[in-house]
């Protein structure tokens, strides 16, 4: 559809189906990846042209998919020399903006495709980026793709271990541990049969300094699952509250709400659902912290 009718038509169709089909809700982020890949090919790998047609719907997957195509077109022989310039346009337009973030994160997805899902080789590609902020966002794309690729029939991930659920986070350098743990909970939750209480328990045992981000990651998963389940409004807030309240450690519950709020904004590209969740919290300190996170993340996305 992108080639024949354009990016906007493809998104209009996707948004229409999103309201009707549970499969589309569950797979929406990956579907927007496909639109982004096609758009990048249509615009000859030009990042500004591709981004000008973009849409943040379903977690900005369009931009991540676009970068997968851009990296693939550059190729392994040239990518390390050119990587630092790939995100130059969004960086110069507004450093650390949402477009800049999506570009750097998308590069991580692209490196995984280019290097056959080799996590550590892809992280070495992220290492060539001169900005620490870009390296962090790039690594997040690597770890996200690694978890997604568990179900890749043609090239499943080699860097996931059921008996070591937080691998490879345990083995990557400190700079990349937080981006890893916040995404690895998706895999851990799946392996635990969506038992949120069990994953809270496992997060409580990870290495010192990274338990809070593990709880945030689980909050992301709670919000994502609520969307996939088709819950909305008060039912969605109730589902998220119920799951996050399973945390037993002092910091577990509020950090779970932080992750859920950020993911709701990420998924819907607005703060309606996030604020509804915050307002539903009965503890005043949690409610205030929740609303503050919502405001800060919305401001971050508007940069």
Question: Which residues are covered by each model-predicted region?
Answer:
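Non-catalytic tandem-repeat scaffold regions and their flanking low-complexity/translocation tails
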Residues: 1-303
């Amino acid at each position: 559809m992108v080639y024949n009718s354009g990016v906007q038509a493809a998104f209009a169709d996707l948004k229409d189906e999103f309201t009707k089909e549970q499969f589309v809700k569950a797979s929406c982020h990956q579907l927007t990846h496909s639109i982004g890949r096609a758009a990048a090919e249509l615009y000859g790998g030009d990042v500004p042209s591709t981004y000008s047609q973009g849409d943040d719907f379903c977690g900005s997957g369009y931009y991540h998919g676009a970068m997968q195509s851009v990296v693939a077109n550059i190729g392994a022989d040239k990518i390390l020399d050119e990587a630092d310039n790939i995100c130059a346009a969004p960086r110069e337009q507004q450093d650390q903006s949402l477009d800049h973030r999506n570009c750097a994160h998308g590069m991580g997805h692209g490196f995984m495709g280019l290097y056959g899902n080799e996590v550590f080789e892809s992280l070495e590609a992220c290492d060539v980026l001169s900005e620490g902020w870009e390296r962090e966002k790039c690594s997040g794309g690597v770890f996200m793709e690694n978890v997604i690729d568990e179900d890749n029939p043609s090239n499943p991930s080699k860097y996931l271990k059921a008996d070591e659920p937080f691998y490879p986070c345990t083995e990557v350098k400190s700079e990349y541990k937080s981006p890893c743990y916040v995404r690895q909970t998706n895999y851990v939750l799946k392996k635990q049969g969506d038992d949120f209480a069990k994953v809270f328990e496992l997060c409580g045992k990870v290495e010192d300094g990274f338990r809070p981000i593990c709880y945030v990651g689980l909050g992301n998963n709670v919000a994502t699952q609520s969307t996939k389940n088709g819950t909305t409004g008060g039912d969605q807030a109730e589902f998220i509250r119920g799951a996050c309240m399973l945390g037993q450690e002092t910091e577990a519950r509020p950090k779970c709400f932080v992750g859920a709020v950020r993911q709701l904004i990420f998924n819907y590209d607005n703060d309606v659902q996030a604020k509804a969740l915050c307002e539903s919290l009965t503890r005043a300190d949690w409610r205030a912290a929740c609303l503050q996170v919502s405001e800060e993340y919305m401001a971050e996305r508007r940069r």
